[in-house]
Amino acid sequence: MNNFAQRWLFSTNHKDIGTLYLIFGAIAGVMGTCFSVLIRMELAQPGNQILGGNHQLYNVLITAHAFLMIFFMVMPAMIGGFGNWFVPILIGSPDMAFPRLNNISFWLLPPSLLLLLSSALVEVGCGSGWTVYPPLSGITSHSGGSVDLAIFSLHLSGVSSILGSINFITTIFNMRAPGLTMHRLPLFVWSVLVTAFLLLLSLPVLAGAITMLLTDRNFNTTFFDPAGGGDPILYQHLFWFFGHPEVYILILPGFGIISHIVSTFSRKPVFGYLGMVYAMISIGVLGFIVWAHHMFTVGLDVDTRAYFTAATMIIAVPTGIKIFSWIATMWGGSIQYKTPMLFAVGFIFLFTVGGLTGIVLANSGVDIALHDTYYVVAHFHYVLSMGAVFALFAGFYYWIGKITGLQYPETLGQIHFWITFFGVNLTFFPMHFLGLAGMPRRIPDYPDAYAGWNAFSSFGSYVSVVGIFCFFVVVFLTLTSENKCAPSPWAVEQNSTTLEWMVPSPPAFHTFEELPAIKESI
C-alpha cells in the first residue's frame, strides 16, 4: 500500500501523472456521456419523458454534461494525458520542468469534480447552462449553494490548468534536447505550447468574471446587476473572452495529434511544417479577438457586429491551411488505414463540416435567426464531439502501444470507429435541420413538428453508447493482452521521425539516461 501511495499519490513522474489524467478523463467522460444520453432520452419524443416535467433538472443535466466533457474529459485527457506523457519524450527531456507542480495540477482535479457533482445535488442544482449567465445564475434565480459550488469547481480546475500550462511552457522553452530548435519541434509539442499560452491568458479572465458573480451572489455587490449600476452584458464579454479561446484549447492538441498520425500512416513528412506551426499560432492569436460572435443578439453596434463577423471568418484561413496540409500530406502517400488513421480521416472530414457551419454562424445577420437554436448545438458538437473526441480516440490507438507496451486488437478498434462514426453523425446531423426549423436549445420539450428528427437524433446517441462500450472492451483486451508492442509499431523500417518511437514500449520509468542529441537531417 505504501509503495502504491508513493507511486501514484505522490508521483512526480510525467508518465504516471499522464496515466492518472487519462484514467480521470475516461471516468469523467463516462459520466458526461451518461448525462448526454439522459438528455437525448428526454428529447426522444415530444412531451415529458423520463424527467417527469422537472425542467430545472433538465438544465442541470445540460450544465453538468458541458462542464464534465470540457473541463474533466477533453482537457485532462488531451493536455494532461497525452501532453504529459509525450511532450517530455518528444523533446528529449527527462521529465517536466516542475514535477511536483505537475502532481498538484492533477490532484486539484478530483476535488474540483466532486464540487461540480455536489453542485448538482444541493438545492435544485445549477441549471444555468455552462455559460452561467446572470441574472439566471444570480442569487434571486438560483438561491442556495449550487451555483457557488459550480463556481468553486471552475476556480479549482482553472488553477489546475494554469499551473499545468506554466509547466508546459517552461518545459518546452527550456528543456529541449540539444539541436532540437523551435523550428524542428514536433507538431504535437507546438500545439500543446500554443494551447498552454491560450490557457494562461484566458483563464484569469474567467476567474475574474466568476469571482465577481460570486460576490454579486453572496456579498451584494452589483457588478452584473443594473440596479446598482452593473451590467449583465459585462459578464458575457468576460466569459466569452475566455470561452472562445477555450474552444481552441480543446481542439489545438487534437490538431497536433492528427498531424502526427496522418504523417505516420501516409508514410510522408507533414506537408508544409512551418505553415502548420504558423497556422496554429495564428489560430491562437485570432481566437482572442472574436469573442463577441457569441453575442450577436445582445444589441451590439452594427459596426461591432461587422468587425466580429469579418474577424471570425479570418480564422477559417489558418484552419483551412491545416486541413489542406493534412490532405496534401496524404496525397500520393502509401496510406495504411489502421484505426488511428481512420479516426484521423474521420476527424478531418467531420471537423471540416463543423467548420463550414461555423462560417455560416459567423454571419451576424444569419446568426440572429440561428442563435440559441439546435443549429449551434450541431455546429459545436461536430467540432467537439467529432473533432476533439475523434482526436482523443486517434491518439489513444496511436500511442496506447507505447504507453502500455501491449498491442490493441485492430479489428475491434475498427469496429469501434465505424459504430462511433455512424452514431455521432446520426445524432448531430439532424440537429442542423431542427435548428434551421427554429428549435431552441436548452429546452426540454418541443412542438410535435420537430418529433421526427429528434427521434433520429436520440437513436444516434444510443448507437454512440454502443461505440463507447466497444472502446472500453478494446481497453480491457489491450491491458490483458499477451501481444507485446514493438518500440516503433507503425514503422516499415526504422524511419521514425519523432523520439517516442526510439525508446522502448513501454518507456523506462526514466526515459532518457542521457540527453539525446538531434543532428541536422540530410
Swiss-Prot record:
Co-factor requirement: heme; Cu cation
Pfam family, one: COX1
Binding site residues for Fe(II)-heme a: 65, 381
Spans traversing the lipid bilayer: 19-39, 67-87, 104-124, 149-169, 187-207, 238-258, 270-290, 313-333, 341-361, 380-400, 417-437, 459-479
Residues noted as binding Cu cation in the record, renumbered to the chain: 244, 293-294
Assembly behavior: Component of the cytochrome c oxidase (complex IV, CIV), a multisubunit enzyme composed of a catalytic core of 3 subunits and several supernumerary subunits. The complex exists as a monomer or a dimer and forms supercomplexes (SCs) in the inner mitochondrial membrane with ubiquinol-cytochrome c oxidoreductase (cytochrome b-c1 complex, complex III, CIII).
Membrane disposition: Multi-pass membrane protein
Keyword Transcription regulation: no
Name of protein: Cytochrome c oxidase subunit 1
